Curated annotation (Swiss-Prot):
GO terms for biological process: chromosome organization; DNA recombination; DNA repair; telomere maintenance. Belongs to the helicase family. PIF1 subfamily. The keyword Hydrolase applies. Monomer. Gene3D superfamilies: P-loop containing nucleotide triphosphate hydrolases. This is ATP-dependent DNA helicase PIF3. One of its GO terms (molecular function) is 5'-3' DNA helicase activity. The keyword DNA damage applies. Its main location: cytoplasm.
Length: 812
């Protein structure tokens, strides 16, 4: 769609949500107020599917290019109308909130950082050409030279600020303006303003570590020996450099990431262990990249999801496995969002990013859309290295040489002819790999139907609805039948002011939860979210006490009640009651609907009932102990009552108690006993997966108890990427579709040629993406010490400054 615009108009796009529905309104504002020069034309580009929306204002110098995020616009929901800018637009910048929400990108860093900054008094992204910015600059504020996202106070201009200049701030109805006027009127303003700005920016970037980013160490690492190239990479990572770790299949990339995670966390750093696929995230013991940072899913209609700013601020290091499945545009957006969330201009906002993967394995489905990840500008901030020592196959093994040829696109007809042989031995020890999911599912169903033994169906058990995190008791505030029911933004503003007045603490907006009270038409439940070690309700004048101190409970309850009563009074409402636990009928029905949707889309496999029979072949899909891991296969020998002695042990101590909720509800009266190919016999307990717990569900969620098992006869190549398979593996390429590196990934899942059988393969199926091959060949050999010297201009993570005495150099 193309819109021709007059020279005095520029179009902004904003979106508003109501429950599950949304609409888009394009509003035109006069251009003369916003830009110093005329615009020749303005064009709005949008995608029918999931492409990004871009607003392009063209002049002689092409003044601005603002990307408004990957959201879908329905034609029927679009309205275009010109209107004049209002006073509130310039005073509050509310119409520009879409810039903060979606991020600012697609134009050079120097241009962007010079055009916008974060207002410390509102936490919003503010354009330098707007009225708010001009007023702040006139009062002595200016861009920080070190960090253009921030403002600094020039005390030499304090004497130049007159009472007349402050008068509009004193009489303003906006709270932050009045507070700023009072601050500038103080005798010690020269020092107080700078201190207040520093404190406010610290509040904006404050964060807590969410449970999804809390990853345990893998106890199996203590028995593993790192190769020389792995040790070199660890040394480089401990110096704070961002890196890309490449290497062929079986070179120990996942093991290396776990070792880096352990070293960095032992230094006191907070590390996000993520992967782009569910299988890879299970191998790491972390979570998916999209879940960790709230990545909006392309193509989802009506999505309300935004990047999780708290996650960016809560960690020091981000580890991303299987990064080849991220395209250049998404990786670029990730880097921009990190800088915006952390208010730092350095690459990734000062985060250390350790990406890992093999671009000669499976990548995203359509690389032509955004280009591979390594073609992004952000990827240049990573030191590229390559692991060269194989841990899956022995060096000099003919099979290792065959894989090396496949990796670069060479087809050995004689070798593959030898691999096309009949299956021998026990058919239960055979895993079939297919290019397409439907073929794998069909084989699993057929094999299960062939068995005439006892069958059991294990349906996932849902835990009770619960709040995920640490919260204050909820206060029920009611406005009866009054028509002037305040908006959520107004409630948050007044509540923040009362918390500041009573406790002396500033609260970040995202820690305030305002939830409609179920069937009550004009009532809300209000609570605060806080970290485990800090409860703002017992703070006074900026101080804090340890949670759990003496008489803390009484002080907390007293302060919280006073805050709620004052807030309700100012908003002409009434505080009815404070609940330690929300009444079930007060939880909005939309919460259950959202949780149902959250379960159906990303966790469809988890919520589907699992059918098992005695004698069926299964694969374990979680890392449960040193010897029972994701990819282990075995045969179901029995169904029996839970026996703790048969549960896999992650440590040498007694196994963790079985889920008490499951026992109480008798959700799993019998559990499968599996004999693994190694001979070990284990009983598989249900594991819990948390669904929800996000702002869209008012932080409500529930546990889903599922068995960490799946039928183990057939899988797709995409499903087993990153796994080492046991027993005989049969690859059937009969229904092959054009996909680079597919055959190489499938063949490299085993340790030896004796395990592999390949059928219906042809030379034209061996496809290698040339650009990926060129990139991989240019990687530095990690086994050579000098290759890890950082290039000129390579920056280190911001955590280096505070932990410099603990750093380990390459020469140590």
């Amino acid at each position: 769609m193309r819109l021709a615009a007059e020279s005095s108009l520029v179009f902004f796009v904003s979106h508003f949500y109501f429950e599950r529905f949304f609409s888009f309104v394009m509003v035109a504002y006069t251009l003369d107020t916003l830009f110093a020069s005329d615009i020749d034309s303005a064009t709005l580009f949008y995608s029918e599917g999931c492409g990004p929306i871009r607003l392009v204002a063209l002049s002689a110098q092409m003044r601005r290019l603002v990307r408004l995020g990957p959201i879908r616009v329905a034609k029927a929901c679009v309205e275009v109308r010109p209107m004049a800018p209002t006073k509130e637009f310039f005073e509050e910048g509310r119409q520009l909130q879409h810039i903060e929400a979606a991020g600012v990108g697609d134009f050079p860093d120097s241009e962007r950082s010079g055009d916008t900054f974060v207002n410390p008094f509102t936490g919003r992204l503010t354009p330098t050409w707007g009225r708010v910015a001009k007023e702040l600059f006139s009062l002595g504020f200016e861009h920080s030279i070190v960090n253009p996202f921030r403002l600094v106070w020039n005390p030499t201009k304090a004497a130049l600020v007159s009472d007349a200049a402050l008068q509009p701030f004193r009489t303003s109805t906006v709270t932050w303006r009045r507070n700023l006027a009072a601050l500038l009127s103080r005798r010690d303003a020269a020092d107080a303003v700078g201190e207040e700005i520093h404190r406010l920016y610290n509040e904006i970037t404050s964060a807590y570590l969410p449970p999804k980013l809390d990853t345990m160490h893998d106890p199996r690492l203590s028995t593993m020996t790192m190769t020389p190239d792995q040790q070199n990479v660890i040394r480089c990572a401990l110096r704070g450099y961002s890196m890309f770790i490449g290497g062929s299949a079986g070179t120990g990339k996942t093991v290396l990431l776990k070792a880096i995670h352990r070293k960095l966390t032992e230094m006191g750093l907070r590390v996000a262990m993520t992967a782009t696929t569910g299988v890879a995230s299970v191998q790491l013991g972390g979570c998916t990249f999209h879940l960790a940072f709230g990545v909006p899913i392309k193509g989802e209609e009506g999505t309300r999801k935004r990047w999780d700013s708290n996650a960016f601020r809560a960690v020091d290091v981000v580890i991303i496995d299987e990064v080849s499945l991220l395209d250049a545009e998404l990786f670029e957006t990730f880097e921009e969002e990190a800088r915006m969330a952390r208010l730092q201009q350095s690459p990734f906002g000062g985060l250390q990013v350790i990406a890992c993967g093999d671009f000669l394995q499976l990548a995203m489905m359509d690389v032509s859309i955004g280009g591979p990840c390594y073609q992004s500008h952000a990827f240049r901030h990573l030191i590229p290295v390559c692991l060269v020592t194989s841990m899956r196959q022995a060096q000099g093994d003919p099979f290792c040489e065959l894989l090396g040829q496949l990796r670069v696109g060479k087809f050995d007809k004689k070798a593959f002819k030898a691999l096309d042989r009949p299956v021998s031995g026990d058919a239960n020890n055979v895993t079939y790999i297919f290019p397409r999911r439907c073929d794998a599912q069909r084989l699993n169903d057929e094999k299960l139907c062939e068995l005439r033994s006892e069958e059991m169906i294990f349906a996932p058990q849902r835990g009770p609805l619960q709040l995920v995190g640490n919260f204050t008791p909820a206060g029920l505030v009611d406005w009866g039948r009054k028509k002037d029911f305040p908006k959520r933004e107004k409630i948050i503003t007044v509540l923040s002011e009362e918390i500041k007045r009573i406790t002396g603490v500033d609260i970040v907006d995202h820690n305030i939860v305002v939830m409609p009270a179920g069937g009550e038409k004009n009532a809300v439940l209000i609570r605060l979210r806080h970290s485990e070690d800090r409860n703002v309700l017992i703070c006074k004048n900026g101080g804090s006490k340890e949670h759990g101190a003496s008489n803390e409970g009484g002080a907390e309850e007293s302060h919280w009640r006073a805050i709620l009563e004052a807030t309700a009074g100012r908003l002409k409402g009434k505080l009815h009651q404070i609940y330690n636990q929300d009444p079930h009928n007060f939880i909005p029905p939309s919460v259950s609907l959202m949780l149902a949707d959250a379960s159906l889309h990303p966790n469809a496999e988890l919520i589907s009932p699992l059918r098992l029979k005695l004698g069926c072949r299964v694969m374990i899909n979680r890392n449960l102990s040193r010897t029972v891991s994701n990819g282990s296969v075995g045969i179901v020998e029995a169904f029996a009552a839970p026996n703790l002695d048969l549960f896999p042990r992650r440590h040498e101590t007694s196994p963790k108690a079985f889920h008490t909720w499951s026992l109480e509800r008798n959700g799993f009266q019998r559990l499968p006993i599996v004999r693994l190919l190694s001979g070990e016999v284990v009983q598989l307990p249900p594991l819990s997966v948390m669904i929800g717990g996000t702002p869209s569900t008012y932080f409500y969620g529930h546990e889903l108890f599922v068995l960490p098992l799946q039928l183990g006869y057939g899988f797709t190549v995409h499903k087993v990427q990153g796994l080492t398979l046991e027993g005989t593996v049969v690859l059937d390429c009969k229904k092959f579709f054009e996909c680079p590196h597919l055959v190489y990934v499938a063949c490299s899942r085993v340790r030896s040629m004796d395990q592999l059988i390949v059928r219906n393969v042809r030379s034209d199926m061996i496809i290698v993406r040339q650009s990926a091959l060129d990139f991989t060949n240019a990687l530095r050999d990690a086994s050579v010490m000098s290759s890890l010297d950082p290039p000129d201009g390579c920056t280190r993570a911001s955590w280096v400054r505070r932990l410099s005495p603990l750093l380990v150099g390459l020469t140590d």
